[in-house]
Amino acid sequence: MNLQQIEPDIFISAQISVENIKKLAQMGFKTIICNRPDQEDPHQPDFSTIKTEAHKYGIKAYHIPIVPPTIERSDIETMQTILKTAPTPLLAYCHYGTRSMHLYRLARL
């Protein structure tokens, strides 16, 4: 798991595993945002699996699936709301981290 810090309490990463969630909890993360649609890759865990594991550790989990190359206005608005209201530290992830970074930047405009 390679975390890229983009603000003091905001991080971006590539796909996380269910096993990473315990480590994220130990690091103090309070919120996870998944920007991958389910079934994008046959080897990725479904969001529901990530969410269930996150909740075991008291981590909030949100799903804003982005299908390249389009980021919808509603996705940006949802991200803006989460960034304003969700507890931090916060991690947003997708396959490589690129979609999460683009969505974050658009939400901060």
Report each predicted region and the residues it spans.
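Cys-dependent protein tyrosine phosphatase-like superfamily
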Residues: M1-L91, T98, H102-L109
